[in-house]
């Protein structure tokens, strides 16, 4: 059992590497810009919805079949959609990812639909909490995001136990996937946010450099005048 779980962790990390490479490539485009700030405008919210819905669906596609279910990294897209975009974006990302998962079938399909929606909402509530308290440093913290993803995955396991039937099959499934999915989704969400945070720091550095250069030009202009 331990060897099977270890093998599943390795497999999920292989899929996660592809996932993060795609995220890194996206970070080199202007589309990544809205993800580095608290999203207020609707165009930015729509873009966040599209991007994180894509990652949510991708997390399912990159998943691995385990006993008529799918071990996956879907929670990363749902949680980050809520954290970056807010409750509405989180709900819509979770709904999109959940409907897609339901379409694939399996005895956990309905439970995974509910849990994905709940994960998006959880991220959205965390967003609202930190924005209301003006703690954007925590909102963009990889440690916080990883912790939220961990809680989201534990919540998903609970929903599977409550909803999926037969119950014995649900228990057996969770015994096999809980450790690999907790590790993969927690680290994956933290690494994704680290990427966003690094991009955010780079933009701030460029902004400071541009402001300093503009100030020097203004000073020279004043001397001429």
Residue ranges and their predicted role:
Residues 76, 95-100:
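Hydrophobic transmembrane alpha-helices of multi-pass, membrane-embedded glycosylation machinery
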Residues 74-92:
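Generic transmembrane alpha-helix motif of multi-pass integral membrane proteins
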Residues 224-225:
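Signal-transducing coiled-coil linker helices
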Residues 30-36:
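N-terminal membrane-insertion alpha helix
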């Amino acid at each position: 059992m331990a060897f099977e779980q270890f093998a599943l962790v390795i497999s999920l990390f292989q899929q996660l590497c592809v996932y993060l490479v795609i995220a890194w490539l996206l970070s080199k485009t202007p589309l990544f810009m809205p993800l580095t700030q608290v999203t207020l405008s609707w165009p930015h919210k729509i873009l966040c919805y599209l991007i994180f819905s894509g990652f949510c669906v991708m997390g399912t596609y990159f998943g691995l079949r385990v006993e008529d279910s799918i071990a996956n990294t879907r929670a990363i897209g749902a949680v980050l959609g809520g954290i970056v975009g807010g409750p509405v974006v989180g709900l819509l990302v979770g709904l999109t990812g959940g409907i897609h998962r339901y379409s694939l079938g399996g005895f956990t399909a309905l439970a995974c639909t509910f849990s994905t929606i709940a994960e998006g909402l959880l991220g959205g509530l965390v967003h609202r909490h930190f924005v209301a308290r003006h703690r954007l440093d925590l909102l963009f913290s990889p440690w916080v995001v990883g912790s939220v993803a961990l809680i989201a995955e534990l919540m998903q396991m609970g929903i599977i136990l409550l909803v999926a039937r037969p119950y014995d099959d649900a228990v057996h499934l969770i015994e096999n996937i809980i450790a690999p999915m907790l590790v993969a989704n927690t680290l994956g969400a933290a690494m994704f946010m680290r990427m966003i945070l690094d991009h955010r720091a780079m933009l701030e550095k460029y902004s400071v450099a541009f402001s300093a250069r503009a100030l020097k030009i203004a000073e020279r202009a004043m001397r001429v005048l």
